[in-house]
Amino acid sequence: MSWQTYVDDHLMCEIEGNHLSAAAIIGQDGSVWAQSATFPQLKPEEVTGIVRDFDEPGTLAPTGLYLGGTKYMVIQGEPGAVIRGKKGPGGVTVKKTTLALLIGIYDEPMTPGQCNMIVERLGDYLVEQGL
């Protein structure tokens, strides 16, 4: 299965009538493996900040999580495994796997819990597969 199929079929899937606004699977070096058409262009320093927060949980909290220049307030995640961010009625979930970062961006009417479920479910599966 291609990385694009994972994005199209597993991250951009429908859940209770809602979809993520954008999603991507990127390497921990910042290389984009697959993304939805609506996913923002990431800056290298944004990816570096995310990876640093997984290695040293809490480093993004004071400055916020940036994706494509958009700032998200960091909210409670799972140190070393999941980073969650909020911006107005929407937000983001970032799940770290062995090799990659899965990023899901949502807006109303999707809920934070729905976004978390979609991103973390695929992330857990990829971790089980050694990816």
Curated annotation (Swiss-Prot):
The keyword Cytoplasm applies. Belongs to the profilin family. Occurs in many kinds of cells as a complex with monomeric actin in a 1:1 ratio. Keywords: Actin-binding, Allergen, Cytoplasm, Cytoskeleton. It is found in: Cytoplasm, Cytoskeleton. SUPFAM superfamilies: Profilin (actin-binding protein) (SSF55770). It comes from the Eukaryota. One of its GO terms (molecular function) is actin monomer binding. Pfam families: Profilin. The lineage of its organism: Eukaryota, Viridiplantae, Streptophyta, Embryophyta, Tracheophyta. GO terms for cellular component: cell cortex; cytoskeleton. It comes from Fragaria ananassa (Strawberry). SMART domains: PROF. This is Profilin. Binds to actin and affects the structure of the cytoskeleton. At high concentrations, profilin prevents the polymerization of actin, whereas it enhances it at low concentrations. By binding to PIP2, it inhibits the formation of IP3 and DG.
